[in-house]
């Protein structure tokens, strides 16, 4: 298959990024979900680039997603940090995060650290909790890999076994214990959105083994594993899923509730980076 038939956005993005931050090779790429952008404020020697300047990056239409890439150092580790992501429901399909993920691969990243705000399917895991993801169930339509396979990045058929790296999860657990807060592990259920799930759908998700539900994560994780980036992911619980509480779900409520876990979230990530530095 001719490479001319595939996007070169990733190559353009690498060139653009290197004009802003020459001789910089990030080890870890972060994707920060709704209300979780405060982590980027901790980055030192930082440079910020609007997604509008990066071909193929998702120009977000969602409040709480700043839409910029921040490059710099966090706990001494070179990082690339997406303040906001694209979602399937914004109209670009399951490939909305693919160019960004492949750009990180070409930049030299070894690990994708994915975060998101999510609803809990477990009554004992309430708002303010953090959940390290150990697997996912995809209820979105298809995957980012549908269509011609770009062999520059990975093989047509690939495994999602240990997609959420077990060794890195163990390291997160160690950090949480040291910091003195619980870190639950769970299975993430993806949902297309933008409407929230029905109570009947939530009951189904519980039956099939889900622990948390959200409208992101899966497209970028599949894209990352296709190009052999390791993945670790943490959900910040902002609400009980529909039918499990009397709270009316809204995006404003999600943003407000993200504040409950903000400090533990920052401490977890900074502690994790110190251990891999």
Task: State what each model feature region is.
Residues 175-211, 269, 276-277:
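Active-site/ligand-binding-proximal alpha/beta "capping" segment
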């Amino acid at each position: 298959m001719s490479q001319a038939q595939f996007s070169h956005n990733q190559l353009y993005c690498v060139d653009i990024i290197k004009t802003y931050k020459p001789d910089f090779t990030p080890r870890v790429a972060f994707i920060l979900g709704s209300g979780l952008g405060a982590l980027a404020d901790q980055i030192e020697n930082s440079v910020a680039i609007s997604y509008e300047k990066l071909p193929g990056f998702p120009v977000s239409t969602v409040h709480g997603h700043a839409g910029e890439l921040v490059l710099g150092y966090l706990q001494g580790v070179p990082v690339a940090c997406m303040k906001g992501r694209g979602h399937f429901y914004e109209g670009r399909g399951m490939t909305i995060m693919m160019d960004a993920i492949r750009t990180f691969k070409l930049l030299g990243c070894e690990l994708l650290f994915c975060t998101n705000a999510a609803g809990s399917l477990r009554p004992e895991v309430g708002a303010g909790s953090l959940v390290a993801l150990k697997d996912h169930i995809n209820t979105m339509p298809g995957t980012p890999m549908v269509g011609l396979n770009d062999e520059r990045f990975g093989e047509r058929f690939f495994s999602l076994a240990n997609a959420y790296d077990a060794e890195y999860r163990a390291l997160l657990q160690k950090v949480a214990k040291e910091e003195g807060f619980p870190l639950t592990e769970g299975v993430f259920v993806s949902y297309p959105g933008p409407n929230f799930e029905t109570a009947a759908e939530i009951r189904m998700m519980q039956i099939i083994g889900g622990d948390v539900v959200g409208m992101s994560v899966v497209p970028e994780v599949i894209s990352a594993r296709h190009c052999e980036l390791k993945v670790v992911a943490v959900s910040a619980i902002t609400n009980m899923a529909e039918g499990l509480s009397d709270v009316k779900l809204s995006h404003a409520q999600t943003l407000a509730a993200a504040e409950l876990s903000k400090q533990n979230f920052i401490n977890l990530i900074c502690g994790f980076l110190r251990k891999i530095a």
